[in-house]
Amino acid sequence: MSTHTLEARNLVKDFTRRSGLKTSVLHAVKDVSFTIEAGKTVALVGESGSGKSTIARMLMKLETPSSGQILLDGKDSGMRGRAVEAYRSQVQMVFQDPFASLNPFHTIVHHLERPIRLHHPKLSSAQVRARAIELLERVRLSPGESFAERRPHELSGGQRQRVAIARALAPGARFIVADEPVSMLDVSIRLGVLNLLADLQREENLGVLYITHDLATARHFSDEIMVLYKGDVVERGPADDVILNPQHEYTKTLLGAAPEPENLGRLRDEVRAELAGR
């Protein structure tokens, strides 16, 4: 059986900047290539402005690459019409800000039913509702019916991000682009959301691109780490190898700038102990 893949091939993104009569070109992403396999998590690590979110936006068809290709299962994903619609049913995004990514005027169940209807038009209203409730319970918002008719302001930040994860799964996505999914949450609830993502990744055999500046979580939750610096991938490899034996000076700088480098391993031990105790 073939493995499903999401591939970025030689992605380049340039932005033209104007200042008065002068123009300049910002090379935001420079010839970046990688492949995400179903059931695997790849972390894209770098400081703000390194190009991480630009790559995410290109993968989600929110930005058009200056050059390069995005392939789903080895086929070009296209940029228009039904090709993009089919692509987006398979590739979904969890945005950074759970307070802005949900419409405050709509109920929680509406946020889930809409993509289900869009991508599965043959389902009856009852089937759509049942699928939405099932998704709420899959992300540990249980019982689902008790959350369905609430609005975003009635949920905590962590609960909202769980809804965002459920919405990403609603079309039947096989790949998730998670752009700093816990950076705006309280430290006390970050681990729970990341554990949920890890569980869903295993249970659903999802491919995940985990975008972060947090090396501790990148090490634990990823199979592979790519380090991005000014639009270039300067280092990549198995997560432990990159963290424990960094080769590039920028990776060493990121590790040196971590508030408590000794916690890079401790987080892994804590999470493993928690998962083992379930």
Residues covered by each model-derived region:
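ABC ATPase NBD coupling module
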Residues: 20-23, 77-92, 110, 118, ...
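Conserved ABC transporter NBD signature motif
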Residues: 68-79
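Conserved ABC ATPase signature
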Residues: 151-155, 159
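Helix-to-loop junction immediately C-terminal to a conserved catalytic motif
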Residues: 60
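A short, surface-exposed alpha-helical micro-motif characterized by mixed small hydrophobic
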Residues: 218-220
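Short catalytic/signature loops enriched in Gly
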Residues: 2-4, 18, 25, 142-146, ...
